[in-house]
Amino acid sequence: MASSSDSWMRAYNEALKLSEEINGMISERSSSAVTGPDAQRRASAIRRKITIFGNKLDSLQSLLAEIHGKPISEKEMNRRKDMVGNLRSKANQMANALNMSNFANRDSLLGPDIKPDDSMSRVTGMDNQGIVGYQRQVMREQDEGLEQLEGTVMSTKHIALAVSEELDLQTRLIDDLDYHVDVTDSRLRRVQKSLAVMNKNMRSGCSCMSMLLSVLGIVGLAVVIWMLVKYM
């Protein structure tokens, strides 16, 4: 029977050592400036450790059931149950601290940055119901932040639409102005062509008049000479 008790204590000490290791990993991750894929790999490693830790606690609970009723005092049995319960509470706290740290990027977008170690200190000492309540509060605050962000995005979208409509109007006005300029240019060219034709016709008319006057002058001169010859 002592062997069963000793095996339980060995298993408990292993679980306790693992919990301390996980705490160290979480603290190291909290104080590290690593982001991106490396941070995700660290988080995955911690999550695997927490899963193993939970399995060890299940094994401790099963071992307690096996030694129940054997030569071990009720007080010792209750003490060991409390020891397992404390480790399970610690497992929940570590899991929730890890979940809180995964919100870091989202928090930095929506509002004040909540560091993972701050989340760990806040959930320390809380029971499961308190931890769940704290998580719900954080999620509610994040949802409110998302609503505010959505409002800002919608406002920006409306401004962008108004600017786009104004640009379309200005484009149409410029197109209309180009059309009127083309029409005016075409009319100006027609007027210039008409003026050129009129100028050419006027020049032709002046030449004919000059020839007519020349002929009349020659005829008049011939008449004068004839009269002078006749009456001399």
Swiss-Prot record:
Keywords annotated in UniProt: Coiled coil, Golgi apparatus, Membrane, Protein transport, Transmembrane, Transmembrane helix, Transport
Keyword Transmembrane helix: yes
Residues in the signal sequence: none
Transmembrane segment boundaries: 209-229
Cystine bridges: none
Topology versus the membrane: Single-pass type IV membrane protein
Vesicular side: 230-232
One GO MF term attached to the UniProt entry: SNAP receptor activity
t-SNARE coiled-coil homology domain sequence ranges: 136-198
Cytoplasmic domain ranges by topology: 1-208
Compartments where located: Golgi apparatus, trans-Golgi network membrane; Prevacuolar compartment membrane
An example Gene Ontology biological process: vesicle-mediated transport
Keyword Transport attributed: yes
Tissue expression pattern: Expressed in root, leaf, stem, flower and silique.
Gene Ontology CC annotations of this record: endosome membrane; Golgi apparatus; nucleus; plant-type vacuole; vacuole
PANTHER family: SYNTAXIN (PTHR19957), SYNTAXIN-51-RELATED (PTHR19957:SF285)
Function of the molecule: Vesicle trafficking protein that functions in the secretory pathway.
Complexes and interactors: Interacts with VTI11 and either SYP21, or SYP22, or SYP61 in the prevacuolar compartment, or with VTI12 and SYP61 in the trans-Golgi network to form t-SNARE complexes.
Family per similarity comment: Belongs to the syntaxin family.
Miscellaneous comment: SYP51 and SYP52 may have redundant functions. The exact location of the SYP51/SYP61 complex is unclear, but is probably on the trans-Golgi network because of the likelihood of containing chiefly VTI12.
Protein name per the record: Syntaxin-51
Organism: Arabidopsis thaliana (Mouse-ear cress)
Gene: SYP51
